[in-house]
Amino acid sequence: QALPLLELPAPALATLAECGLMRGCWSLMLRYDKPLDLPFDAAFVKKGPLRWVARDSSKPGRAPEEVWLLHANADWSEAHLEDVPGEVALLMLAAFAELGAPLPKIWMAQRWRYANTEPAFDQMFAWEPQQGIGLCGDWLNSGRVEGAWTSGRALAQQVIASFGLR
């Protein structure tokens, strides 16, 4: 998304940004009236559209409602990226039913168009000191939310050091 902004002032950063292919991911949040009797709180799924399922309500400090989060795998998500959310939800619900889950009381599908990077970078951040331009984000540091936070923090520290602000 930022490529046009980087091409003129920071061609090396533009090249880096161009190297990563952003892939989409469908997720589905489910709410149930009562806890599900499944033998797991989270699982990686190796067949069908699902990649990851988790009992979100099992995390400490969560509300008592039974809530599950489902993530579809990247290939399936890409194949269905422009599908209607309701249709995607039904396909994902059917896959979750194969794991023993009933239909939820409420569900909501969410398409994340830019969810994952291929290849996965592992460089924390990128910085062009002459231009004072940097890049950070989950796409540069593991692809997860904690990677986004540590990437942003590391770039902020670099900016502070570069401008002698400490």
In which residue ranges do the predicted regions lie?
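Active-site-proximal substrate-binding core of FAD-dependent oxidoreductases
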Residues: 158-166
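Short FAD-binding loop at a beta-strand-to-alpha-helix junction that anchors the flavin cofactor
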Residues: 67-69, 124-156
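Central helical "cap/lid" subdomain
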Residues: 1-40, 101-102
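Flavin (FAD/FMN) cofactor-binding core of flavoprotein oxidoreductases
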Residues: 90-131
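Active-site substrate-recognition segment that forms the wall
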Residues: 29-81, 87, 91-99
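Aromatic-acidic/polar surface patches that form glycan- and anion
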Residues: 19, 81, 85, 141-148
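Short glycine-/acidic-enriched loop or helix-start segments at secondary-structure transitions
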Residues: 2-6, 118-119, 145-146
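Short Gly/Pro-enriched loop/turn and capping motifs at secondary-structure junctions
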Residues: 75-77, 112-117, 140-142
